[in-house]
Design a protein with these regions (language model features):
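An acidic- and aromatic-residue-enriched active-site/binding cleft used to recognize and process polar
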Residues: 19-20, 159
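Proline- and acidic/polar-enriched loop/turn elements at helix boundaries
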Residues: 18-19, 192
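Charged, low-complexity surface segments at secondary-structure and domain boundaries
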Residues: 13-14, 33, 84
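Short, hinge-like loop/turn segments at secondary-structure boundaries
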Residues: 6-8, 31-35, 171
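An acidic, carboxylate-rich microenvironment
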Residues: 2, 25, 165-168
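Hydrophobic helix-rich structural segments at or within alpha/beta enzyme and signaling domains
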Residues: 44-193
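Juxtadomain coupling helices with adjacent low-complexity linkers
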Residues: 23-56
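Extracellular/luminal Protease-associated
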Residues: 1-18
Length: 193
């Protein structure tokens, strides 16, 4: 019981299994689930990238995203620019993405997180703006602590309703992050520009 209490206090995941379950089978199953989840995340990321670069295909994309997102709900895009990120190799980019994504575990709605056009992109679906701002604030502080030598800029787009409008939130986030980079602000909300 002491171990369970300690793990709960530290927010450390504890896996308990019955004795008859073989650890090798459990690890294999868990690994397969992780691989499948990563593949699904990559496909969703590609769909959002397509939506941003080819908005005329939004109806086709809408059909493909229906299983994972409420396409009639609200969408909001956040762009995260990190100083000199254009010089990151794939391993460094993956390491930074992992650090950023640790902060998103509290998001209880559908979201996508990926690298696109020089920025880390977070697309959230049906998430209250106050909760998003709290998560972004936590992520910013954590990133500054983990990477003190790099300046981080955030651009937060407007919350839009329906998948058709996600491109507008993306463009507004891009304008906001561009302003943040230009004036050396850590964070700019499009609505406050």
């Amino acid at each position: 019981q002491d171990i369970i209490d300690y793990c709960n206090e530290q927010d450390f995941p504890l896996l308990t299994t019955p004795w008859e379950v073989h650890m090798a089978d459990l690890i294999k199953d868990f690994s397969m689930r992780c691989l499948y989840s990563q593949k699904e995340d990559n496909e969703i990321s590609k769909l959002f990238q397509k939506a941003f670069s080819m908005p005329q295909l939004i109806e086709e994309i809408r059909q493909q995203l229906m299983g994972a997102f409420d396409v009639d709900g609200s969408f909001q895009v956040v762009l995260i620019g990190i100083e000199d990120s254009d010089q990151f190799d794939a391993i460094e980019r993956r390491r930074v993405a992992f650090q950023l994504e640790l902060c998103f575990e509290k998001i209880e709605s559908s979201y996508a997180f990926f690298w696109f056009d020089g920025y880390f992109v977070l697309v959230v679906n049906n998430l209250d703006s106050e909760i998003l701002e709290s998560i972004i604030d936590k992520m910013y502080k954590r990133t500054k602590k983990r990477m003190p030598s790099r300046f981080i800029h955030l651009g937060i787009g407007t919350q839009m309703h329906d998948l058709h409008q996600v491109i507008l939130s993306y463009k507004r986030a891009k304008a906001a992050v561009t302003m943040a980079e230009q004036f050396k602000y850590p964070m700019v909300l499009f609505e406050e520009m």
